[in-house]
Amino acid sequence: MTTALKVKTSSLPGSRLALEVGVPADRCKASYEAAVERLSRSVRLPGFRKGRVPKPVLLQQIGPLRVKASALEDLVDSVLRDAVEQEKVEVLGQPSLSGNFEELLEKFDPAKELVVTLEMDVAPTPTLKSTKGLSAEAESVAYDPARVDELLDQSRRQLATLVPVSDRAAAMGDVAVVSFSGVFSDDKSAIEGGSANGLDVELEEGRMISGFVEGVVGMKPGDKKDVDCQFPDDYPEETCRGRKALFSISLDELKGRELPELDDAFAQQASDKKTLSELREDLENRLKQDAEQRQKNNRHEALLKALVDQLEVELPESLIKEEINSLLQETAAQMAQQGMDVKKLFTPETVQNLAQASRGEATERLQRSLALKALAKAEGISVADKDLEAKIKEVSAGFSDTNKIDPQRLRDAVAEDLLRETLLSWLEENAKLTMVDPASEDKPAKASKAKSSKAKAEKEPAAEGQAKAKPAAKTSKSKTKAAEKLITPID
């Protein structure tokens, strides 16, 4: 049985802990002798069989410093493991020596006790200054009936038939078939890939770099025109960022949109509904649900912010880095789902920039999670087993093949969601939540304590009524890949 180590613990800033460990001389000696034995088995010397090199010869050939270094490496690893286990420390990340290895090696004498100081990140202990009586303001979200007509119009545009136009000038909403070439205004150098023949351009605000669409509007088929444009500062192609350009544009063809009639036939084409009235009703329900969900999200955001304001915690760096990595993995997964080549896009420089940009979001996510954890502990809030089992059963019913689901991971995820729901519902009942009209924030609505049946803050759902909408007919002609890259629509 290993003799208990003499350990002194001291807290460090940033949720770190220092362990000063006194290593007995006999353990130092044992580690040194084990290193000699290990090296004698692995070192090959002329005149000696492998594993039979005498200790004096070994020390003479490879040097006592190498033996001591090998012994100290193993000693530090074993001491760290035993000290953490003995003191029951929840370590995050990789512990490190206080000071450098070379300094410790100079002090290491196998015949004497050695003091090793180790530093490590530890799980933070979040506390809340207050849990009840919190005040928060959230923007109300109202259902807007006008959005029904807007969505119907969007769907009609998507299903529109493109017809040639020759008797008028190009207008916003048309599709222009253009040929163009561009040069930079400052040095008149050609823009790499900044040319195309027969490129379809939707004449909509923000679809192209500034000035391009505006320049085409007013042209008639057969017209040629020089148009001043401006590349945005955040343009993907670095050589173009912020620069002015001159494009010589010819309007080869103009197409107008012939919208379908707003009737039952349109409803059947645009969705799975049989009549226009059914489609309108479906859109109304979707938009109402969307407004309710967004208002609920606003309430939860406001309550979480108020709760985080009460949080007292120091975040260890290793935990922040872990959360950043999680965010980067989510980003990579989303890009992969969109068909992007993640390996090609995620260069070391890109990953570094994304990591730096994600630090704020990672910190905020950790603070929210720890604030909810502290609330659960302070108020003794938990999820009942029967509720957990019922929810797991409900979620499992939505899977086509439950054999592919890890039961423990599913249980953990459902338990986390249910606890979050319970905690946010508790906050709504115990906080003063004022709903504010976003159109006139100086006239706050009456304070409310509306209860919530589901607490996980979900992403705002898109209120798209044009289910199964069909794309407009494509009639694009030849175009260069470079032009697609440089003159890409800017969303």
UniProtKB/Swiss-Prot annotation:
Gene3D superfamilies according to UniProt: 3.10.50.40, Trigger factor ribosome-binding domain (3.30.70.1050), Trigger factor, C-terminal domain (1.10.3120.10)
Subcellular location: Cytoplasm
Gene Ontology molecular function: peptidyl-prolyl cis-trans isomerase activity; protein folding chaperone; ribosome binding
Major subcellular site: cytoplasm
One GO cellular component term: cytoplasm
EC number, as in UniProt: 5.2.1.8
Low complexity bias: start-end ranges: 463-475
Domain of life of the source: Bacteria
Catalytic reaction list: [protein]-peptidylproline (omega=180) = [protein]-peptidylproline (omega=0)
Domain note: Consists of 3 domains; the N-terminus binds the ribosome, the middle domain has PPIase activity, while the C-terminus has intrinsic chaperone activity on its own.
Family listed: Belongs to the FKBP-type PPIase family. Tig subfamily.
Protein known as: Trigger factor
Organism of this sequence: Synechococcus sp. (strain RCC307)
